[in-house]
Amino acid sequence: MQITDVRIRKISSEGKMKAIVSVTFDNEFVVHDIKVIEGQNGLFIAMPSRKTPTGEFKDIAHPIVMDSREKIQNEILSAYAKAIEEQDVEE
């Protein structure tokens, strides 16, 4: 499965959540609401999730294989860095 599009839908300079992203696979399947989060060890992605009645968050969709997660994260963080760079140029 190939990542065919990464769309940075919202960028925030405040707080730990830096962006909300949509990723399209093979021009056929899209996953919305992936978050770019700033953690203690740098940026990472959080897959879309929902809160359970017990207050725990569960992923709605997520990669099963670690290599897939790394590939998705690398593509998203690369697109995020490019969007930030373009935003700085426009300002």
Swiss-Prot record:
Keywords carried by this UniProt record: Cell cycle, Cell division, Septation
GO biological process: division septum assembly; sporulation resulting in formation of a cellular spore
Keyword RNA-binding: no
Domain of life (superkingdom): Bacteria
Protein task: Could be involved in septation.
Matching PANTHER family: SEPTATION PROTEIN SPOVG-RELATED
Similarity annotation: Belongs to the SpoVG family.
Alphabetical list of HAMAP family matching this protein: SpoVG
Protein's name according to its UniProt entry: Putative septation protein SpoVG
Organism: Clostridium botulinum (strain Alaska E43 / Type E3)
